[in-house]
Regions:
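Conserved RecA-like P-loop NTPase helicase motor core
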Residues: 1-26, 189
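Short, aromatic/basic amphipathic alpha-helical patches
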Residues: 4, 29-38, 120-129
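Hydrophobic/aromatic beta-strand patches that form the interior of the parallel beta-sheet core
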Residues: 17-19, 60, 111, 134
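ATPase catalytic-site recognition across NTP-hydrolyzing enzymes
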Residues: 19, 25-60
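Charge-patterned, long linear interaction tracts outside catalytic cores
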Residues: 32-35, 180-206
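Acidic two-metal-ion nuclease catalytic site recognized across multiple nuclease folds
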Residues: 41, 46-47, 87, 196-206
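Gly/Thr-rich phosphate-binding beta-strand-loop-beta motif of the actin/hexokinase/Hsp70
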Residues: 54-77
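Mg2+-dependent endonuclease catalytic cores in nucleic-acid-processing enzymes, primarily RNase H-like
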Residues: 78-180
């Protein structure tokens, strides 16, 4: 398990490598970070996927339909940080797509934030998997939750540089995250990320 200092140094070093490997995406993200809610000293933080971590908790946080998007975050706990190792970011189509995405991602528990309309789907999902499936009703004022959890994101959430380079859905998720402001409709990624943070803090996993 890496110490905070070791992990921080490696993360900082890896960001410089990312500039060379995917400079176009990095410059685009950097411009967004300067004005972004989640920017800490002008940057968001990445983890080095080549560094071995002892993950102690693995969570899926899912919103089946937020502004017409199905968003899933797969987050693993490493020390006192959370690594966003994968995401699903796509138009909401069928519950079968949602089910297959949940079942194909490793986790200790899965949290689904949704309206009552998805409860029959969740009952069926629970009968078809041994995963722990938790349900949360949609938060009534997501902008307030986003604002309340943004400092935690700055300090404790690390994103995958390799996914930014290679995964179109991860890039779309990051673009959506960088473009968030409370007056826009671009809030799908922030809504789900804030839900994840609320969940881990509530359970004392922060």
């Amino acid at each position: 398990l890496q110490t905070y200092e070791e992990h921080g140094h490696l993360s900082d070093t890896f960001r410089y490598v990312v500039v060379d490997l995917c400079s176009e995406q990095y410059i685009e993200f950097s411009n967004r970070r300067k004005r972004n809610l989640y920017a800490c000293n002008g940057t968001v933080n990445f983890f080095n996927p080549d560094t071995e971590c002892k993950y102690t908790k693995k969570i899926l946080y899912v919103m089946p339909n937020v502004n017409g998007k199905f968003v899933l975050i797969q987050a693993f706990r490493c020390g006192n940080k959370w690594h966003v190792v994968d995401v699903v970011f796509m138009d909401t189509t069928s519950t079968e797509d949602i089910r297959s995405s949940i079942l194909s991602h490793e986790s200790d528990s899965c949290v689904i934030e949704c309206t009552d309309a998805y409860f029959p789907f969740i009952r069926e999902l629970r009968s078809s998997t041994n995963k722990e499936i938790r349900v949360m009703k949609e938060f009534p004022d997501v902008d307030k939750r986003i604002a309340a959890t943004s400092d935690y994101v700055k300090n404790s959430i690390l994103f995958s540089a390799s996914k930014v380079e290679s995964d179109t859905e991860y890039v779309a998720f990051m673009n959506n995250l960088m473009d968030y402001n409370k007056d826009s409709e671009t809030k799908e990624a922030s809504a789900v990320l804030s839900g994840l943070v609320q969940f881990v803090v509530k359970l004392g996993l922060n």
